[in-house]
């Protein structure tokens, strides 16, 4: 499995690789980090699976764009290669990185991402605002996004939940509901087992 560690900012890519390898050892999967590759796109073309870790989405997108990985990964996904991404890794699977929660600490070439799905993901979705916080809630920020991007669906994916897309069918896995946003549609929630075909 090819691992993309480029969302790491305060620790090294090698440290991230080791951390991820330790977890995947439990299920017998060998991890190869793309930062060691002389030809990153070739590594993607030869990958049996692709895993993109969390961290800072802007740092991740910038490095992926510099190495031409967005299109290479999309091509592999279309061929049936499994893709796993958490946090920033889920953001880059979307058409854009515009619904990340991260600070723009570096400037990528654009906000465009892999586009493996047609909707936007907001990972770590929270309902509550911290006590004493006078800024926008997560929901308010997403409502701003759909105001500017009225054709796009956004899903608020809560902690401990994931989306599994296989053979043209998608399911929510986890014990918490997922919040759904779209311009002109009253915000609603879906649970594990609900039909998500409207997002595809």
Where are these regions (language model features)?
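N-terminal beta1-alpha1 cap of cysteine-dependent amidohydrolase-like domains
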Residues: 1-53, 187-193, 200
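C-terminal and late-domain segments of enzyme folds
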Residues: 3, 11-15, 99, 103-200
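Short, active-site-adjacent cap segments at secondary-structure transitions
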Residues: 10, 57-58, 90-93, 162-164
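Charged helix-capping and loop-helix junction motifs
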Residues: 18-19, 65-71, 105, 136-138
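General beta-strand structural signal in soluble alpha/beta enzymes
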Residues: 32-34, 52, 84-86, 155-156
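Catalytic nucleophile loop
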Residues: 51-54, 77-96
């Amino acid at each position: 499995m090819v691992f993309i560690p480029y969302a790491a900012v305060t620790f090294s890519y090698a440290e991230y690789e080791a951390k991820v390898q330790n977890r995947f050892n439990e299920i017998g999967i060998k991890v190869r980090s793309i930062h060691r590759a002389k030809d990153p796109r070739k590594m993607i073309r030869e990958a049996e699976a692709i895993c993109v870790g969390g961290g800072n989405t802007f740092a991740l997108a910038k490095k992926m764009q510099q190495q031409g990985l967005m299109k290479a990964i999309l091509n592999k996904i279309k061929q049936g290669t499994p893709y796993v991404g958490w946090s920033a890794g889920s953001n880059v699977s979307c058409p854009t990185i515009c619904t990340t929660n991260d600070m723009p600490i570096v400037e990528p070439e654009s906000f465009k991402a892999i586009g493996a799905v047609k909707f936007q993901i907001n990972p770590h979705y929270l309902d509550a605002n911290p006590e004493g916080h006078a800024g926008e809630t997560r929901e308010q920020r997403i409502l701003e996004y759909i105001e500017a991007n009225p054709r796009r669906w956004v899903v608020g994916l809560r902690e401990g939940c994931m989306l599994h897309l296989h053979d043209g069918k998608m399911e929510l896995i986890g014990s918490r509901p997922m919040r759904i946003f779209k311009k002109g549609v009253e915000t609603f929630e879906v649970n594990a087992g609900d039909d998500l075909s409207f997002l595809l």
